[in-house]
């Protein structure tokens, strides 16, 4: 057990001893007489929070079957009053969500508290308890009319849970001793349950996947391995749109339009020309999906390898991952080479839904040089921003973005979009980026091309990313005209006249505009449908 867990458990023992001096077990028993429990073990989804009333209401409206409330006061700033407030919010609903007390429970007194303050279910963490303690707490939970969700993180902990006759088991994909996430933990535990001759489901062990769930693909993966529920917390809190995110997780609903099936999916956002860890984290906190690092020595935004490594490490840690994820996801999507760019974009969206990615931008380097740099730095994608062509992609070991350079709208009467399309070859670059070309510059030009070309690419089932002259003020229009998979910004979020120096207010405004675009577009379509 890690020191932090030992410290928390020790503190909770002190907390319980103090609470017993203030509120007796008899007082709690009287309070329990006035509360009812409705919990049953078949739940499709769980969600968790420290419970402001508006969040509880939002989760309930989104279809949560259970709302998990943190009640540990010192480290997680929770309280029993938070849980009672959550119960009061959902009370009276015809199919109200169950309330789960999420805490470090080590004493039967805490179960009495849970029942008295409105809980239907409690979390029991195996790594905190002996088998004898677990048996005692499970029995006491059931005697109080509640259900015990028993959390395990390994096959060894599973055996302890099964010996205690636990039948509702949550597999935490996060190891509480190291805080590392392993998304295969649930599958390993599910296999172990079957190997022990037990079934998964209503008549056997009800299995829940906890932690790290960020996409519909994750949900499908756990459903296939036998899980009957999921717990989603931080990902929902960061999403900004609980209802839409829950629907996406559970149903994978997409909307289509005449401009192509990607048009009304959330646009991805890449912030490029990042030169410091501070800038990267600011972009990530505001919702950036990709962080771009310039590896071209002639660029004013060039980053030395040591700083690039620090930025890449910070991005991985922010996304709670230790290595690349896109390559593995691409393998599952590219078993069939047909509809090449469509399949690649699906994989990119899935990867970005799990964690932000790091892109290294190169100009006229050899495949050997780019492979070596990508491995040393820890890149997820290699962006080709020079005159490399497409064939070089065969020799690059990482997913690639190929930039196509288009003229500035002010410098030409028009562009032959069909001729541009002819430059693209399937089966080579994974993604296409449309950017503006300016003599003497490759990227970061601050000028725009004709955004209608991006729309032509989308209609031709060549979904692309779009860069060139994008700013917080014009990105919504660019998205509305071009319908790209995502947008790429660099100079548009910088301090004027200072390449590589990000204006964090502009970064936040740009990313907010990208996020808000989808809500505006969806509202417009809904209004048109009603009319």
Swiss-Prot record:
<dbReference type="GO" id="GO:0000162">
    <property type="term" value="P:L-tryptophan biosynthetic process"/>
</dbReference>
<keyword id="KW-0057">Aromatic amino acid biosynthesis</keyword>
<keyword id="KW-0511">Multifunctional enzyme</keyword>
<dbReference type="GO" id="GO:0004640">
    <property type="term" value="F:phosphoribosylanthranilate isomerase activity"/>
</dbReference>
<keyword id="KW-0028">Amino-acid biosynthesis</keyword>
<comment type="pathway">
    <text>Amino-acid biosynthesis; L-tryptophan biosynthesis; L-tryptophan from chorismate: step 3/5.</text>
</comment>
<keyword id="KW-0456">Lyase</keyword>
<dbReference type="InterPro" id="IPR001240">
    <property type="entry name" value="PRAI_dom"/>
</dbReference>
<dbReference type="GO" id="GO:0004425">
    <property type="term" value="F:indole-3-glycerol-phosphate synthase activity"/>
</dbReference>
<protein>
    <recommendedName>
        <fullName>Tryptophan biosynthesis protein TRP1</fullName>
        <ecNumber>4.1.1.48</ecNumber>
        <ecNumber>5.3.1.24</ecNumber>
    </recommendedName>
</protein>
<dbReference type="InterPro" id="IPR013798">
    <property type="entry name" value="Indole-3-glycerol_P_synth_dom"/>
</dbReference>
<feature type="region of interest" description="N-(5'-phosphoribosyl)anthranilate isomerase">
    <location>
        <begin position="255"/>
        <end position="531"/>
    </location>
</feature>
<dbReference type="InterPro" id="IPR013785">
    <property type="entry name" value="Aldolase_TIM"/>
</dbReference>
<comment type="function">
    <text>Bifunctional enzyme that catalyzes two sequential steps of tryptophan biosynthetic pathway.</text>
</comment>
<dbReference type="InterPro" id="IPR045186">
    <property type="entry name" value="Indole-3-glycerol_P_synth"/>
</dbReference>
<keyword id="KW-0210">Decarboxylase</keyword>
<keyword id="KW-0413">Isomerase</keyword>
<dbReference type="Pfam" id="PF00697">
    <property type="entry name" value="PRAI"/>
</dbReference>
<comment type="similarity">
    <text>In the C-terminal section; belongs to the TrpF family.</text>
</comment>
<comment type="similarity">
    <text>In the N-terminal section; belongs to the TrpC family.</text>
</comment>
<dbReference type="InterPro" id="IPR011060">
    <property type="entry name" value="RibuloseP-bd_barrel"/>
</dbReference>
<dbReference type="Pfam" id="PF00218">
    <property type="entry name" value="IGPS"/>
</dbReference>
<keyword id="KW-0822">Tryptophan biosynthesis</keyword>
<comment type="pathway">
    <text>Amino-acid biosynthesis; L-tryptophan biosynthesis; L-tryptophan from chorismate: step 4/5.</text>
</comment>
<feature type="region of interest" description="Indole-3-glycerol phosphate synthase">
    <location>
        <begin position="1"/>
        <end position="254"/>
    </location>
</feature>
